[in-house]
């Protein structure tokens, strides 16, 4: 756990003890935000430490979390906040699970879809790539990834030892954010009271305690896509940060999808995904709408059994392909060609029945 007094050296070259007394105080920090100034990484770490240790008041948490988002967070600030928050998480060692990937989004897109990323996770793991999914219950929709997995029969509150074993046995592990980020209990009530996106929406996808090096990251907020990409680059991750032009925090099959790519060398780029360019199709808005946990779980079972085609199937395939592209890399063959190849790999995993068997193995029962 990080100390309350930051040890980092400021850009000016001054050490913390040489800085003004107000530098590491809420009035000083919030004053900088109010004036439109950037915070140093040390100030962000100090603020996150205060929040995670339970030393900050609700008013201070709200002012920081909402204020830094409204002012416009930088990649350096976001990376510092993510690093500090993850240092308070329950640690899990996945160093012996190579090439694991997370498929996760910020939420808050208002589309209330079926659980695309969770279904895509079954397909990805069936294709031989381990998934360490970091998720939670629904916040603004009827059913989050944790809700659907629980409805399928998975015990979501599993110990670090259990999920390590899950990853080895099945190629899939689910880390329930509420369990693995206990310090977030200090910020949770404020987030609920605000009812508006804050820095914590961006931090959720960046604070997987397993530290996966690869990810398909949905971002519902267009203006923060390059910021998240820059922060992931600082973490040394290879990811795709995606947002459908319909606002969906997934790769959409209702519109093209904008992508910020972060490659293995930390270079960022931009792409656009068109489903028709990878052998899939476009569908009407609303064709991915889901329901409660039982409904979405039933959709997952029917999809894996081959009883569902069309929009939901294509959405799962293209998002699974996005995650596989992040793991396998696009530097050699180009992004679009790599994605097209991975769609076919995802299709084989789903249509062969391998994804159904994988889901049954993960939840421990047959459907």
UniProtKB/Swiss-Prot annotation:
Cofactor dependence: Mg(2+)
InterPro entries, per the entry: Anthranilate_Pribosyl_Tfrase, Glycosyl_Trfase_fam3, Glycosyl_Trfase_fam3_N_dom, Glycosyl_Trfase_fam3_N_dom_sf, Nuc_phospho_transferase
Recorded superkingdom: Bacteria
Disulfide bonds, paired cysteine numbers: none
Binding site for anthranilate 1: 105, 136
Keywords: Amino-acid biosynthesis, Aromatic amino acid biosynthesis, Glycosyltransferase, Magnesium, Metal-binding, Transferase, Tryptophan biosynthesis
The protein's Enzyme Commission number: 2.4.2.18
The record's free-text note on cofactor binding: Binds 2 magnesium ions per monomer.
GO MF entries: anthranilate phosphoribosyltransferase activity; magnesium ion binding
Cited PANTHER family: ANTHRANILATE PHOSPHORIBOSYLTRANSFERASE (PTHR43285:SF2)
Protein name (database record): Anthranilate phosphoribosyltransferase
Species of provenance: Corynebacterium jeikeium (strain K411)
Lineage: Bacteria, Bacillati, Actinomycetota, Actinomycetes, Mycobacteriales
């Amino acid at each position: 756990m990080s100390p309350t007094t930051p040890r980092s050296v400021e850009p000016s070259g001054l050490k913390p003890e040489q800085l003004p007394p107000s530098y590491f105080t809420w009035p000083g920090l919030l004053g900088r935000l109010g004036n439109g100034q950037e915070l140093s990484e040390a100030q962000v770490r100090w603020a996150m430490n205060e929040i995670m240790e339970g030393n900050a008041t609700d008013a201070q948490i709200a002012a920081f979390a909402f204020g830094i988002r409204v002012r416009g967070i930088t990649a350096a600030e976001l990376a510092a906040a993510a690093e500090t928050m993850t240092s308070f998480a329950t640690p899990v060692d996945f160093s012996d699970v190579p090439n694991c990937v997370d498929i996760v989004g910020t939420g808050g897109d208002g589309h209330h879809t079926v659980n695309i990323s969770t279904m895509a996770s079954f397909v990805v793991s069936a294709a031989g790539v381990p998934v360490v999914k970091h998720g939670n219950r629904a916040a603004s929709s009827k059913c989050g990834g944790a809700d659907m997995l629980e409805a399928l029969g998975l015990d979501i509150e599993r110990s670090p030892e259990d999920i390590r074993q899950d990853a080895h046995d099945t190629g899939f592990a689910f880390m329930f954010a509420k369990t693995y980020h206990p310090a977030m209990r200090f910020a949770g009530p404020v987030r609920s009271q605000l009812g508006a996106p804050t820095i914590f929406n961006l931090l959720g996808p960046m604070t997987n305690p397993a530290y996966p090096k690869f990810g398909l990251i949905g971002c519902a907020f267009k203006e923060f896509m390059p910021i998240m990409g820059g922060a992931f680059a600082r973490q040394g991750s290879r990811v795709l940060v995606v947002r459908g032009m319909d606002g969906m925090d997934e790769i959409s099959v209702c519109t093209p999808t904008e992508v910020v790519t972060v490659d293995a060398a930390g270079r960022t780029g931009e792409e656009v995904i068109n489903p028709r360019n990878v052998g899939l199709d476009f569908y009407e808005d609303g064709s991915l709408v889901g329901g409660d946990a039982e409904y979405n779980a039933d959709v997952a079972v029917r999809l894996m059994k081959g009883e569902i085609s069309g929009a939901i199937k294509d959405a799962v395939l293209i998002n699974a392909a996005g995650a596989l592209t992040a793991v396998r890399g696009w530097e050699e063959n180009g992004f679009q060609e790599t994605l097209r190849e991975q769609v076919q790999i995802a299709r084989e995993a789903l249509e062969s029945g391998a994804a159904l068997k994988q889901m049954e193995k993960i939840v421990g029962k047959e459907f």
